[in-house]
């Protein structure tokens, strides 16, 4: 079970790098990327994950253009070489750790990608994220995030899309630890009290002089179990932004947001107000493999050298019905006003999900929608 990493002094416990320190089946190690051109016409989301206790590695590319959302999935048996991240035709080349990398997917199911990332700001280490169901830890993860630009090209069914770093922007994160993956486990005794829902907001955005990474999670009563809100300056300074107040603006009759108003506090005491708008929504549980996806689940064994392509009509009532029951990633635009200073424009990701009951939003159960 030895691999190339075992040549280096990077071990944390007395066993090969390929053996996770935890025997939990849900141990994972994953990268997530998104890219868009600030128009709302296209949004690409991609990721690669290793699940050593399940013997699986997989990757995906998800693209929305207009009313069509297309997913390419790749899955294979895990290997021991963590220095060369790859799943079949998909690979991630880390050219300058924490600063630049390259994603390549050679033609697979009619799609190909060659994108180079350059960080616009330093990475920021997020707070450790822990969730429990009863006495069991169901999520225990560490993550870092970064805002950056993209260059290269995307090809779909023979049509090439040029990716100009002057306009293409996005965010990425690396996370590892424990989270639900693969096939569902037997539930055992029903939870008491039962799981009633979760409210989630994640907003990484890049402005000219700074980036922000806002992460907020609340339980059904509105109690905030995660509040990790920072501003990253060009010189590397990281500034905490206090306890933001958030108002999500939902489309009437749905839980799909059109935007949000976020008020935070700079270290100077000045009010920071972000007016965020959605330019294009991508439900990441529709082909992306995230919670509630009925078509693709991260870490599930699909057999050796598995690939597939799925295409969704986002106007299909069945897909619309699915979209409201998961987390949605949006091409995000924001105007930031700090005190009496002129507003500045930023772009990035606006990710939100309101699942189940959330008293502050007026959602009394799993089916309540916005007025």
Predicted features along the sequence, with ranges:
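Structured soluble/peripheral alpha/beta segments that form catalytic or ligand/cofactor-binding pockets
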Residues: 1-371
């Amino acid at each position: 079970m030895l691999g190339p990493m075992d040549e280096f002094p990077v071990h944390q416990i007395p066993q090969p790098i390929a053996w996770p320190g935890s025997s939990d089946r849900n141990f994972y190690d994953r990268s997530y990327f998104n890219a868009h051109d600030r128009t709302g016409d296209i949004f690409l989301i991609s990721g690669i994950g290793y699940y050593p206790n399940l013997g699986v590695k997989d990757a995906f590319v998800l693209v929305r253009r207009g009313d069509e959302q297309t997913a390419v999935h790749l899955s294979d048996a895990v290997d021991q070489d963590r220095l060369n991240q790859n799943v079949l035709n998909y690979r991630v080349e880390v050219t300058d750790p924490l600063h630049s990398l390259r994603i390549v997917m050679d033609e697979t199911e009619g799609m190909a990608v060659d994108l180079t990332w350059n960080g616009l700001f330093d990475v920021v280490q997020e707070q450790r994220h822990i969730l429990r169901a009863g006495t069991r830890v169901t999520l225990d993860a560490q993550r870092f995030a970064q805002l950056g630009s993209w260059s290269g090209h995307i090809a779909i069914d023979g049509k090439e899309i040029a990716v100009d770093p002057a306009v293409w922007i996005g965010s990425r994160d690396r996370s590892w630890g424990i989270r639900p993956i693969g096939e569902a486990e037997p539930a055992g005794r029903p939870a008491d009290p039962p799981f009633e829902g979760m409210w989630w907001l994640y907003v990484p955005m890049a402005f000219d002089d700074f980036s922000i990474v806002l992460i907020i999670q609340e339980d059904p009563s509105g109690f905030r179990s995660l509040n990790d809100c920072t501003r990253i300056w060009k010189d590397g300074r990281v500034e905490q932004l206090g306890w933001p107040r958030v108002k999500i603006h939902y489309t009437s009759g749905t839980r799909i947001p059109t935007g949000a108003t976020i008020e935070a506090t700079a270290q100077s005491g000045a009010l920071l107000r972000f007016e965020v708008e959605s330019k294009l929504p991508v439900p990441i549980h529709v082909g992306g493999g995230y919670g509630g996806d009925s078509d693709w689940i991260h870490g599930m064994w699909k057999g050796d050298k598995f690939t597939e392509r799925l295409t969704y009509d986002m106007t299909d009532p069945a897909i619309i019905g699915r979209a409201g029951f998961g987390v949605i990633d949006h091409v995000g635009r924001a105007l930031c006003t700090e005190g009496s200073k002129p507003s500045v424009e930023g772009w990035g990701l606006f990710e939100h999900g309101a699942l189940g009951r959330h008293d502050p939003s007026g959602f009394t159960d799993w089916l309540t929608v916005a007025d």
